[in-house]
Regions:
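Short coil loop/turn residues that delineate tetratricopeptide repeat
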Residues: 4, 38, 72, 118, ...
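Terminal, low-structured helical/coil segments at or just beyond the last alpha-helical repeat
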Residues: 76-83, 254-280
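TPR/TPR-like (Sel1-like) alpha-helical repeat modules
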Residues: 63-71, 233, 238-255
């Protein structure tokens, strides 16, 4: 490559980005764009630099230029151009997420997946965006695709379990959280979530087992201690409830402020020991 070619200048901007010299990188990529305004990689790089500078709206505009320059026909027929357009669509979606424009984000991820339908990360991000706009069935489809592409993704399985719970499909949610735990036995979030769903199903003893497993994996997991206290309260096991609650508060003193509002503790709201723990 010629030292003053637009490709060379774009590569220089990329190198400056790697060493976090974003202001210099921005000035450099602007030179490349002036030399070749229809060079999609330069616009993609500009978008990346603007993301790192915290200028999300500018980044979205830069990615839009990449998307505009590469026709859909070329994106589907020419792998190199398809990859660049896919990256621009995906990164534009991520920028929308950071701007909390989740509907726009989901739409961009959808477009990106038409170019590369086998991207685990994009299916996962699409699912998360759909959850934020309340489209649970679409989110479930996205998480299903993510777990098909990457069956050992306990993260995607956990999100899928959340959606199933919100859809009222509680037994399926428990099964899905179990799958996440089989992949990662120390995945405390899935163990805790499994316990919460089991409580909803009235399976309180099994819920206790799930919370205990989470605590064994991480004894400082305050949410599991609190949830276990709630379950012991529902079972009428006062001493176990108080012991678990004390541990939760020791780990997270902010719980004191909300104890009186938690319905599961209604039978103990006037209990002297409970009142002491809640700071009354």
């Amino acid at each position: 490559l010629q030292p003053d070619s637009y490709e060379t200048i774009t590569n220089k901007a990329l190198e400056l980005t790697k060493v976090e010299k974003y202001t210099d990188a921005f000035a450099t990529i602007e030179k490349a764009i002036r030399l070749k305004p229809d060079y999609p990689q330069a616009w993609n790089t500009k978008g990346d630099i603007l993301i790192n500078l915290g200028k999300l709206n500018g980044a979205i505009k830069a990615y839009n230029m990449t998307i505009k320059i590469i026709p859909d026909s070329d994106a589907f027929e020419i792998p190199r151009l398809g990859k660049i357009k896919y990256q621009a669509l995906n990164k534009k979606g991520l920028a929308f997420v950071r701007n909390e424009q989740f509907e726009n984000a989901a739409a961009e991820f959808e477009k990106a997946l038409k170019i590369d339908p086998n991207s685990y990360a994009t299916w996962l991000n699409k699912g998360l965006a759909e959850v934020r706009i309340g489209k649970l069935e679409e989110a479930l489809t996205a998480f299903d695709r993510a777990t098909t592409l990457k069956p050992d993704s306990y993260e995607a399985l956990n999100y899928k379990g959340f959606v199933l719970e919100d859809l009222g499909r509680l037994q399926e949610a428990v099964f899905t959280f179990d799958k996440a735990v089989k992949v990662n036995q120390n995945f405390i979030a899935a163990l805790n979530n499994k316990g919460l769903v089991l409580d909803k199903l009235g399976k309180h003893e099994e819920a206790i087992e799930a919370y205990n497993s989470a605590i064994q994996a991480n004894p400082t997991f305050d949410a599991a201690w609190l949830n276990m206290a709630c379950t012991y309260s529902l079972l009428g096991e006062r001493d176990n409830m108080l012991n678990s609650l004390k541990k939760a508060i020791d780990l997270n003193p902010r719980y004191k402020m909300t104890l009186q509002q938690i319905p599961d503790f209604q039978n103990y709201r006037n209990d002297p020991e409970f009142l002491k723990l809640s700071g009354r």
